[in-house]
From Swiss-Prot:
Gene of this entry: kiz
Organism this protein belongs to: Danio rerio
One GO BP: spindle organization
Biased composition (Basic residues): 105-116
InterPro entries listed in its UniProt record: Centrosomal_kizuma
Protein name: Centrosomal protein kizuna
Coiled coil stretches, renumbered: 63-113
Biological role: Centrosomal protein required for establishing a robust mitotic centrosome architecture that can endure the forces that converge on the centrosomes during spindle formation. Required for stabilizing the expanded pericentriolar material around the centriole.
Region (Disordered): 105-184, 215-347, 571-603, 620-665, 677-706
Biased composition (Polar residues): 128-156, 164-180, 308-320
Keyword tags: Cell projection, Coiled coil, Cytoplasm, Cytoskeleton
Amino acid sequence: MAFCNTEYFDQIGNIQKIIHERERRRHELEETLFSYLRSDERLTRLKCAKMRCYAKELHEREQRAKTRNLELLGNVENLASKLKEFSIDCSRLLQKRMEYKNHITRLKKDRRKMGSRGKSEADEHPSRLSTQGLSQSAAIFMGHQTSNGSSRNDGATTKRLPSHTEQIPNHPSLPPSQSGLCMHSHVSKASGAGILSDDILNSGDFLEGRRLSDVREKQMESDWDISQRAREQQRQEELKSPHTTLKEAEVSSRSVTVNKPADIVSLEHCPTRSPSPDTTDPSDASHYMNSGGEDEEESAEDKDDSAPINQNHSDYTSNILKPDTSMHSDSDDSASQSQSGHHASRGNALIQEQSIKAMQTHCGSKHKKVSTWQSGQHHFSESPNRLSMKGFCHLLKCIEQRLETEDVVNLYRISVNEQNLSDDIISICSQRGRLDDIDLHACGAVVLQQLSMLSCSLPHGCLLPSDLINSHWSTTSKPQQIRLCLSAESAVLWDCCFTHMVQLQKQKLLSTDHIIQLFTPLLLPADATYTDKAGKLLKRLLTYKSETHYPSKSESSSSSSLPSLLNDSVEIKPARPSGTNAQTGEEQEIQSAEEDSADQSPVESIPIRETKAYQLLKQSVAQERHWSDSEEEVSEPPDAHKLEKPEVQQDILTQNNRKSVKTKPFSAVQSKAFWGESDDSNSEIEMALRPQSCNTSSHDFDDFYD
């Protein structure tokens, strides 16, 4: 009852008053705080604080920007100083250019002066010899060399070797009248400068003589280069054109014996104009023309470097190809002219006679080459470094057998340069040996080498001639169509090569494009222009072969119990075995067919009568096949039957066995699937599957499908 006294209530009332006062005080403070928060003074202070923060941040950014700008200015100044250091001073180059240009101009002027001085000295040389009584002088000119005075029978001919360094020595036994040969008016500047070196040395112009000798050496080097270039061009033209060639020694009958390189001269390059009576050694004449051509080049360079002069090279070529007809000066000028004309006519007659003989020889060799090409297979098989057709097919089969069991990478992408290994492979394949211990990359290299040789040994010079490619490259999609257009020998090589390509594609060793890029050039001539068409044709054939997938051994054995009804068109049409089935061995197919015929299942032993429509279809297919075989026999040469007889017989046996195995047991099922008849009940299937005796007469099932 202590809770009911007055003290308790007083205490409770005081506590409630205190709580009420504190609550009222809290409300007042909240109102004051809210009014302060909403006051303009506080908002102004907040804005001032934010502005101060912004101002401080801007000041810091300004300081950083100034520092960065100062750094950039310093970098720019450094770059400018480095650019000034590495800048090119073109003024020095221009100055050097002007100096060299002036130097070249001075050299040209000095050269022209030396040439004119040498010419004038050459013109003044005969008079100088007559006054001083020198015992040695010589000149090289475009004509015969005749002696002065009464000594006409003692004339001599001079010959300059290709080195152009030989000089005529002073002969002590000759008198001055005989040593000084008759000078001709047409004397070249270079020859005069080279021959008059003794006179220049005897005179006071020793320095000028040295300059002339330097010019002479440069001219000799240029002459030798041009002669080598002309001879090389002549050899190339002779290789390109089958024209008759003739040696220079056979033209001149009374020429002086001279040690000169024997060059073969083509008839089309022989000069058509008659030889002049002043004809002498062609090397000296070519040297005269070369010196004139060099003077023309100098004048052309002085005239602002105009178009180059090609007359030098052409004149030199025409003179270097001119036959040597050097003759003794046994009589006067008129006699020498008539004699030179006689030798020229005799040389022309000899050229014509040699050309007729050479043309006959060329025709005979060409005829012999054609006959050798026709019988090239016998020589081809006898060569020790070449494979025969059978040996090449054996090599491909060995490679394909090893590809099925071994993992090979980059079969035809690695070249093997061991000749002994290649010879061993060729000898083993020629003897039909095994290649289990030999590297496949070496075998691949031999395949590429021998395929090219075999293709070149065929009658058309290649496996795929141009007429075949042009007629089939856009339409043909089956390999059999290409095979029908080839000869017997070419067909064997085509089967081996195409089967090998299919195996490479099937094993995924090479892509289709790589196979085409690798084998197409080997099946065509070296200069074939239809490579793209042949590549497209091979790509279409390989694509068709990959799309028409032939089952492997396991697939064919697993599916031998019941053939697919969707492939009735392929089963009905008798065709030759494919490349993959032919590769595994046709003898195994014959044995398997005999075993299947011996061990027939109860279903296969049931004789089922075929419909008349199906029999008519089989007859039409057989007639078409007989017609195609007759066309193939007509198109092939008579000796092709000897080469292909075993293969054709084996194909016929394989086709007959396959036809008897496949079409006989399931002819009724195939005919129903072919004609689209429906089988609503299972009674006929049960009847066919029910085991019956093998001697059941066939007339019990006459109305089975009627």
